């Protein structure tokens, strides 16, 4: 027997397509295949009660057909009935029973069956019961399968589109958002969070911090994470939410905390969106979040990347006073400070920092306290190397990183998720992801290391300082610094010192005058060197036919008591012969015989050079050659002017910023992406300056076409696009979108869709005016193109 429900019918006016799809759903999805009864038996009524029940059901449909209001049914009746052939019986599915079947499929984790039944219910009566809808969402989320996650998200999307978001509960939506984030689907994950905030179903900060943490592991996800924190943080600017009202408790539970900011900022750092990260830093005092040790170090990285040296100096006081920073965090801060000194060409401050580190290291090595410390830590060294938290807590033996990674990339059961009302497990998960992000930041520290708890410079800082001194032509200062460094550091042989390596690098790169100047500084400082460096420089002079310099170098070698090898004399003889100076060549040969110098002399430099050019290990000489060959870094003056323009733009003093930009150009400094980003965000903050941004856009394109100093990045183009959309300059907005898509940059369509609906909701609706100018026509076309790109047409 079939269980048939009485259906209340009311005569309404329906569109033909709507009506036909409705009744076809009732018929075709209410089919039961018996497989035992023939067509003949069906025609002669031998199917029994089932056929009678179906006949009764069809009689109801026949009455629909005879009604004048449902005249359209006759068009599709023949199609529906004729499609039923063979051993097929009609059955009207009971929605209540269908709900039960969906629930059973969900309980048994049969996602395909649950989805098939869900689609049947959607075509019959729309969405199932609220509990069933949420259970389907949870089932798809638990699978962590991209196909089912997409179907789950499409289900949620359809519910919001049809205004039935009341069917969706907050916890299943959060669970789905977490699953999407873990599967690398950052856009739908962030959209669900945004929808929850819009509908005032505020997610707890511990829950959405875990979603953000997984989103931040990818480039587009990290950018979206920063946008989400800015959007949610805006709700709490300047204490606008009263904590005394009980009704504000759910909203206050969503307020961004230190961990959320650390996650978003670390993601921005790893994927290079540091100007977006600086916007997050500007928000911190407005929402009253306290900085911890991790946040202080992350701030240092951001200030270094953006060239904010003064901010770094202010931060240094907090770093030095903080009592909960571990060794790694000190490395990272002073590495950032050292890098910033190099960016600004402040070689004096950088060299002073290096010498101070060496001096402290020498004291530590020679002190009795260091010896005691080394003895005490000999048995406890394993724990010392595992210090990971700010207060020096150790990682326990059972904290296996592999098990932690598994927990990060698998879903906790929904039962546990729903019971954890404070979302402590998700908070711990976000903390684990943050630890992984911070570990990647630590790997980027290359200028500083540590010995017995004392910061020490690496070879990389010597290489970078040597390059900076050479580029600025400060040979005397370079020699003075390197000699002091060798005095403070552990002694090395004169032929293997840093200064000799720099001289050899200069020779191999053809910087012979600089090499000669450094040799002179060594000689005047009383530092004795071997013959190999003189031999190398002499041969280089001979190869370039610099006779005067050869004579000068020979005189210097004699003063220093250096005996040249046979290869030098051979090079001198060959040079004289090339210049047709036979008499000079004979004199050199006689001098060589009188000195009793054997052939096959020192070939040390040639071997060293071949080793660097081949696949030898990246030693000090190789690093020097690679660093010096690289293109010169950004002019320090650009950093200075960028800071000035950023200051004025941040304060809203755009006239002063314009004057600074004009002065910057007049001094020969070419503006870069950071310069224009400060200007555009400054104009956007004060509003109604869209013409000025349009002029800047034209200048950016012309500079980018003419020079390589101007490179469009995601942050700059996103700021320009936001301003154009806000002002309704859709022709320019389409240009920016085209450029971003051509460069495969992520565009946050959701943000621009909301922005468009906020300021231009009624624009470009209905038919175009009959009378309009060409410019109006183009503006309308551009607006419609942008609207179509947003998916609003």
From Swiss-Prot:
GO CC annotations, alphabetized: mitochondrion
Subcellular location: Mitochondrion
Transit peptide feature, positions: 1-87
Signal peptide, first to last residue: none
Repeat positions for PPR: 257-291, 292-322, 330-364, 458-492, 495-529, 530-564, 565-599, 601-631, 637-671, 672-707, 713-747
Keyword terms: Mitochondrion, Repeat, Transit peptide
A Pfam cross-reference name: TPR_At1g68980
PANTHER family per record: BNAC05G43320D PROTEIN (PTHR46598), OS10G0422566 PROTEIN (PTHR46598:SF1)
Homology family: Belongs to the PPR family. P subfamily.
Name of the protein: Pentatricopeptide repeat-containing protein At1g03100, mitochondrial
The species this protein was found in: Arabidopsis thaliana
Taxonomic path: Eukaryota, Viridiplantae, Streptophyta, Embryophyta, Tracheophyta
